[in-house]
């Protein structure tokens, strides 16, 4: 009898184990599929984009998402499915886009007659009809996709992301629409879709080809989706309710200095749908209608035959609520659509007073393995001086740097300063300068602003500088001036200034210039933004900075690749603070100097080492050189995406892990001990996103190796000893 009890217990245990294993292994399987899907974050090459024309439908499908359109009686989206988990996102038919022309709203495509908006039954197709006032579908074209930015990297980047090997793989579908209305004769609207290989991602945007008459475009809504609600509430306002988690939206129209996209976004609108009369919310306030358009971009005048291009909307379908997985998905998106963000040169921030100091810094970079010098704010560089003497001076220094294989860059401020009453942003309320994001700021559409753009481009063309540190990028200021040549008035001022700023970044990137800019212009050509820190914290003690920097790294890489953010190391006094805050004299604080370097390089995050020099003695030089050599040895894996293991709290261990399932080194772990005593810990390490199966070999910083067998949950347990106030690293393959 006892034997039977044990046998029954064993069967139950086996059963539960199989259930757990099944749940883990089928989490990404397509509903109804006969095989387990490969996780695209680990093996993306299985999924190829295709555009299918079948009966009365056009279908975008890459094995990870499917978006389907009825063609007749007018084109309309009837299906938007995440194939990794079977989630149907669509509940209602909406227009493909909406445009407001000469104060009149027009629907682009779409069908009418859906009486129930909680769900869409395909058997209702025969009851749907088109409206004569709507733009009607005429035809389509299919092509391959290409980069939106003609990038030309001159700095280090992972081998598989350069333009010679990074082909933008996928398909483009363009849907063409026209109007039956005589007033819009010759006015063509094109709806563009990119579907990418290897990830559940679409890009959508609208182009307009004007006809023979001038028109005013007051709004272009380039995406409209009647989405299934994330949650219901009998009473509740839109801002109180969760939005659909199955789709992540990002556009190339974001700004506000927050160093995060979600806070910088100015285009995503979750609206109510009063035609959805069966919703649970009594006041019809469920946020279930997604629209994408800029808030402040009316009054765009189009001349006859002029072309207009809307913002680009990237739509990434999410299969999980897990923050780490969602972050990895977003980072994979950036690597795919903006591969220039993977460039990651090693630079110092030089504070210089004369040319001799620039040459000395270049020589120190050669001696230590640094790759670039950026003349920081407060240096003697002025890019706005277009005199022959100034250009020749800086070209000679750039030539000196290039002879030694060092890149040279510099700092220039656009916003957060005043130029003149004629060139500053004009406040619509007062009619005077002011009211800008930073209080006072120049208008990019003013004579000075347009001249600034041209001077920057000319400076880089003539001097052959390699890096631009553009502080105060255009932050979205509207301007009420009616005399600035770059915009007509208040209405079109934001749209026109944004295009000037984006055009400048695109031009410089195509010239091979690397761009640091503290605002969210990644999708139009910038490379790096601040990782996310409080500047005055660099006047705190080195001990505090060490912990705070590790917190910043964890927080700033949740949705950014390591290469997308810069950190900061004040070699000399910055923002106040005393001797306890700075590293000079460097040899006297060599332990803290090395700790800060290892933290940043161990995260793949380049810091701005701001000061007049990188070393002051041979001992310091050797430390810097050895740290750089270590980083370069593991550079590829250290630039892979980060999974946080434990956020720094100053009382226990903390650390992170890089993962690269396609690399030779599959993972790299950094452990830190903030306490004054050595620490031995037995830790669970999650290896699922390394793509490894069976066994994994760990090698630590002392060269010791050990092989581990992965559990069914893809985790292993290791015991690690971390030195007091120190660190330990491990590479896994």
Question: Where are each of the predicted segments found?
Answer:
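Active-site-proximal substrate-binding groove within the catalytic cores of carbohydrate-active enzymes
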Residues: 58, 62-63, 500-705, 719-724
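Short Pro-Gly-centered flexible turn/kink motifs
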Residues: 58, 137, 164, 300-318, ...
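Active-site-adjacent "subsite" loops/lids of carbohydrate-active enzymes
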Residues: 394-399, 403, 407-465, 474, ...
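C-terminal beta-strand-rich structural cap/linker in extracellular carbohydrate-active enzymes
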Residues: 709-733
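Glycine-rich, aromatic-flanked loop segments that form ligand/cofactor-binding clefts
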Residues: 122-156, 315-329, 393-437, 513-524
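Polysaccharide-binding surfaces and accessory modules of carbohydrate-active proteins
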Residues: 25-60, 65, 77-286, 294-298, ...
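Extended acidic/polar, glycine-enriched regions
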Residues: 212-215, 276-333
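Aromatic- and glycine-enriched glycan-recognition loops and surfaces
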Residues: 348-429, 450-454, 494-503
């Amino acid at each position: 009898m006892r034997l039977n009890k044990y046998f029954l217990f064993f069967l139950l245990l086996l059963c539960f184990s199989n259930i757990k294993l099944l749940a883990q292994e089928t989490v990404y399987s397509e509903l109804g599929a006969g095989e387990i899907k490969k996780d695209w974050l680990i093996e993306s090459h299985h999924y190829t984009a295709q555009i299918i024309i079948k009966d009365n439908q056009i279908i975008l499908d890459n094995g990870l998402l499917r978006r389907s359109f009825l063609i007749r009686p007018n084109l309309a989206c009837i299906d938007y499915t995440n194939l990794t988990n079977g989630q149907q996102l669509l509940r209602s038919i909406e227009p493909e886009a909406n445009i407001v022309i000469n104060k009149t709203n027009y629907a682009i495509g779409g069908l009418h007659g859906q009486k129930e908006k909680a769900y869409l039954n395909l058997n209702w197709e025969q009851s749907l009809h088109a409206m004569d006032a709507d733009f009607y579908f005429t035809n389509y074209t299919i092509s391959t996709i290409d980069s939106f930015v003609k990038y030309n990297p001159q700095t280090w980047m992972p081998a598989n992301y350069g333009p010679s090997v990074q082909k933008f793989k996928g398909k483009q579908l363009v849907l063409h629409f026209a109007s039956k209305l005589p007033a819009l004769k010759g006015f063509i609207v094109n709806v563009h879709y990119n579907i990418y290989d290897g990830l559940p991602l679409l890009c959508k945007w609208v182009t307009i080809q004007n006809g023979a008459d001038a028109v005013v475009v007051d709004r272009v809504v380039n995406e409209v989706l009647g989405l299934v609600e994330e949650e219901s509430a009998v009473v509740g306002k839109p801002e109180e309710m969760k939005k659909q988690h199955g789709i992540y939206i990002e556009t190339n129209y974001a700004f506000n200095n927050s160093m995060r996209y979600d806070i910088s976004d100015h285009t995503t609108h979750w609206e109510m749908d009063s035609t959805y009369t069966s919703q649970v919310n009594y006041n019809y306030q469920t946020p279930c209608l997604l629209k994408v358009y800029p808030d402040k971009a009316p009054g765009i005048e189009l001349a006859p035959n002029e072309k207009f291009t809307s913002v680009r909307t990237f739509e990434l379908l999410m299969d999980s609520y897990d923050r780490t997985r969602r972050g990895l998905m977003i980072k994979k998106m950036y690597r795919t659509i903006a591969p220039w963000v993977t460039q990651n040169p090693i630079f110092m921030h030089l504070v210089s007073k004369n040319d001799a100091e620039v040459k000395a810094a270049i020589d120190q970079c050669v001696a230590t393995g640094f790759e670039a010098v950026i003349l920081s704010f407060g240096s003697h560089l002025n890019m706005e001086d277009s005199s022959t003497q100034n250009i020749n001076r800086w070209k000679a220094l750039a030539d000196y740097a290039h002879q030694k294989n060092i890149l040279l860059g510099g700092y220039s401020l656009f916003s957060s300063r005043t130029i003149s009453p004629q060139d500053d942003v004009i406040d619509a309320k007062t009619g005077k300068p002011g009211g800008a994001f930073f209080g006072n700021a120049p208008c990019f559409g003013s004579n000075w602003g347009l001249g600034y753009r041209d001077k920057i481009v000319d400076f880089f063309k003539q001097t052959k500088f390699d890096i631009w540190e553009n502080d105060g990028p255009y932050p979205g200021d509207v301007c009420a001036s009616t005399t600035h040549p770059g915009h007509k008035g208040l209405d079109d001022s934001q749209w026109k200034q944004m295009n000037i700023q984006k055009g400048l970044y695109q031009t410089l990137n195509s010239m091979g210039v690397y761009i640091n800019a503290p605002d969210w212009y990644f999708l139009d050509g910038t490379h790096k933004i601040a990782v996310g820190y409080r500047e005055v914290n660099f006047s705190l003690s080195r001990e505090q900075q060490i912990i705070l920097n590790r917190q910043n790294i964890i927080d700033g890489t949740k949705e950014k690749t390591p290469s997308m953010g810069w950190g900061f190391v004040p070699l000399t006094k910055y923002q106040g603070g005393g001797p306890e805050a700075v590293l000079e004299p460097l040899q006297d604080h060599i332990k803290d100097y090395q700790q800060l370097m290892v933290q940043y390089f161990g995260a793949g995050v380049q810091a701005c080492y701001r000061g007049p020099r990188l070393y002051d003695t041979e001992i310091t030089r050797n430390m810097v050189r050895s740290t750089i050599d270590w980083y370069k040895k593991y550079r590829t894996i250290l630039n892979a995406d980060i999974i946080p293991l434990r956020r720094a709290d100053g009382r226990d261990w903390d650390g992170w892990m890089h993962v690269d399932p396609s690399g030779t080194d599959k993972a790299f772990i950094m452990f830190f001990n903030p306490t004054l005593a050595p620490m031995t810990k037995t830790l669970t390490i999650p290896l699922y996103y390394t793509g490894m199966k069976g066994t994994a070999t760990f090698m630590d910083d002392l060269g010791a190796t050990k092989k581990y067998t992965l559990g069914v949950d893809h985790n292993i347990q290791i015991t690690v000893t971390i030195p007091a106030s120190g660190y330990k690293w491990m590479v896994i393959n």
